[in-house]
Amino acid sequence: MTENRIILHCGFIKSASTSLQYELVKSNKNFIGFDPSCKNDKFYSDDELANFFEQVVRFADCSIYNKSYKKIQKRLDQILLQSENDMIISNENLLGKIYPFDLPNRIKIQRFTSVLPNNSVILIIIRDLKELFYSWYKNLVSIGYSENYLYFINEIKIMDKYMSYFDSFNLQKIIHEIKNYRPDLKIEICSIDNKKNFNKILKRNRLPCIKSIKNKGLQFSNYQDSLELNKNKIRGLRFLDWIDIHRIFTNLKINENIKYQHSRLRRHHAKEIQKQHLIHSFSEDKLNFFNNLPKKIEKISMINKVIYDKQV
């Protein structure tokens, strides 16, 4: 009889996470969350685990973590003991310094590995970092960011200078930290840039395959139109003061009016852009975005690819 395990999917952002989460919702696995469909008006089926993985791991001070982690250990053991299948937790924000107020990887890794049983699996999904940052920028624009890509790139350069932002996506350093705290844990790495092996790795870990592993992202006719809309609706929203309120501060589904006010609903943008009947191409903007990214990002991306290729 195969022993049930906890599989923790913990990164990267903008790397087919939502596609995987939707497949997990449909599967027979004991999927705790994050559930993008927000079934029963909740992103997680367990409030204690939601609070720990969404808030305590990423943002809380040491006193809050020290009070909670043993309770979470017992809770995970309890759920796993009662489960007929593997237990899956998916939160792509656990790796990488997504926002300025995210704790460093070292602390987040220490926290989330400290509560996992011995036979647990860490699943990391990677992609080319230039594509990741471009997709992340478009995502921010879709929910209210009001500056062009050059301003955004300057902001992440500032974050890198003071917070080692780019290295928070360095797979070599991430694996080192995981092994430092929990050498017993199994680490599996998928890449959405390698379609051939992506589902093979999921399958060998008893996870559902993804029909399309392309990161869907939001397709606006032109991001300039979205920026103009943002500037008219919200004045001066920038990355360094950005708060993604619906993920950080609650496990409950927020009232639509509050989301509209604070997070800039995606579908609202889509409707507004459609009204403008503008047809443009992202290709030129994307090339300019890539050309202005620091070379360090490409170097880290190459390191990640080498590590992934060795595993495969």
Named regions from a protein language model:
Residues 2-312:
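Anion-recognition interface
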